[in-house]
Amino acid sequence: LPLVPFTRMATVAMTSLRVSTIELGDHVAVTGLGLIGNMAAQLAGLQGATVIGVDLSENRRRLAEACGISHTVAGGEGAAERVKAIAEGGVGTLIEATGVPQVAVESVSWIRQYGELILLGSPRGRYETDVTDLLNSVHLNGRGCITFKGAHEWRFPVEEDPFVKHSLVRNSKVVFGLLKSGRLRVEPLISHILAPEEAAAAYDGLKNRKDEYQGVLFKWV
């Protein structure tokens, strides 16, 4: 039962897989290894990809490894070279889970020709860059012809429908099955189990002490 609350976050993470072209044997990088990024990385691995998790936080990288992510890379300077070395030149899919526009733009160079960038984290904050250069990475064959995709979960219907393969309900059912079988690992992500009266402290920790607070559960009884 303590694992059930993670279903909601894992369903969000699954959206990135549903819109991707990830297949067995592909290389996938995930930028941002918070709850959603961690689970997106795990799901990509379950789909048969070699996954590279990227984060500035050593603690989050350590948690990703505890959840079965075989390759982790420190974000920042030198990350591009390390990712490309693991991915034999570039990843086929990059899942951007931080929501930081600068990270999305700078990680385009990590992607191989005809690869894809999946925006899982909702972009926020102002960021100025050379848009022409970015658009050329999408448009020009010599620059990669990279495909950008949005992974906002509400692109899918809530209820199951015989004419639509994916839905939020179906994704949740899949997640339940993965949690039950132990294939999706979330136990290492539980950092705190708190009383409801400690909600303010929990939200403060999640906002301001992200290395200490990952998955916070409330004990209601």
Language model segments and positions:
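Short gly/pro/ser/thr-enriched loop/turn and capping motifs at secondary-structure boundaries
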Residues: 1, 59-61, 124-127, 156-157
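Mid-domain Rossmann-like dinucleotide-binding core that forms the NAD(H)/NADP(H) cofactor-binding site
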Residues: 2-77, 81-82
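A general structural signal for well-ordered alpha-helical segments in protein cores
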Residues: 10-13, 104, 172-176
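Glycine-rich cofactor phosphate-binding loops and adjacent beta1-alpha1 units
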Residues: 20, 70-149
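C-terminal substrate-binding/catalytic core of Rossmann-like NAD(P)-dependent dehydrogenases/reductases
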Residues: 84, 88, 131-190
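C-terminal capping/lid region of NAD(P)-dependent oxidoreductase domains
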Residues: 118, 127-128, 181-193, 200-221
